[in-house]
Swiss-Prot record:
Belongs to the archaeal Rpo5/eukaryotic RPB5 RNA polymerase subunit family. It comes from Pongo abelii. InterPro entries: Arch_Rpo5/euc_Rpb5, RNA_pol_Rpb5_N, RNA_pol_Rpb5_N_sf, RNA_pol_subH/Rpb5_C, RNA_pol_subH/Rpb5_CS, RPB5-like_sf. The modification N-acetylmethionine is found at residue 1. This is DNA-directed RNA polymerases I, II, and III subunit RPABC1. PANTHER family: DNA-DIRECTED RNA POLYMERASES I, II, AND III SUBUNIT RPABC1 (PTHR10535:SF0). Keywords: Acetylation, DNA-directed RNA polymerase, Isopeptide bond, Nucleus, Transcription, Ubl conjugation. Pfam families: RNA_pol_Rpb5_C, RNA_pol_Rpb5_N. It is found in: Nucleus; Nucleus, Nucleolus.
Amino acid sequence: MDDEEETYRLWKIRKTIMQLCHDRGYLVTQDELDQTLEEFRAQFGDKPSEGRPRRTDLTVLVAHNDDPTDQMFVFFPEEPKVGIKTIKVYCQRMQEENITRALIVVQQGMTPSAKQSLVDMAPKYILEQFLQQELLINITEHELVPEHVVMTKEEVTELLARYKLRENQLPRIQAGDPVARYFGIKRGQVVKIIRPSETAGRYITYRLVQ
């Protein structure tokens, strides 16, 4: 892939990551959300083949709006298929900086042992894997994807009381659903899904993540 195309891809991927962090409630500046390709080139370079930028230059650290101590890393490993050695390096950095959550943007996936290590480290350390291909577009901006809102525990309690329901009576959504992964929704959380409706203005459904 030539430098121009690769620079464009890295810009798109990082832009989606910034939107994802923002949508999860982390503090991202408007400038970062609106960064143009020209601004990306000026900041990081436009010769990936010569290490400008290297993928590691794109690392992001964000803090949550509600709790500045709740921080999240986004790592961009250099190697196409990520092995356990890289995961250990990331985990060590997270331990040193007292950060328990990270996203890893991979080019071609992970080795089986690296994948298993993510499972073994949870729930103390939550590392989520995204293929860069998934991040070239922001799935939540697709016109066919309705708005998803993660509900607080208080909102869920109120919802169940209002409709006299038990949580296990709610319809389900899989934790591996692409939109659920985008928002980092965990099993047991409830999502409010808002669709436009010609008759009612909007149509709301609720889903329990499983």
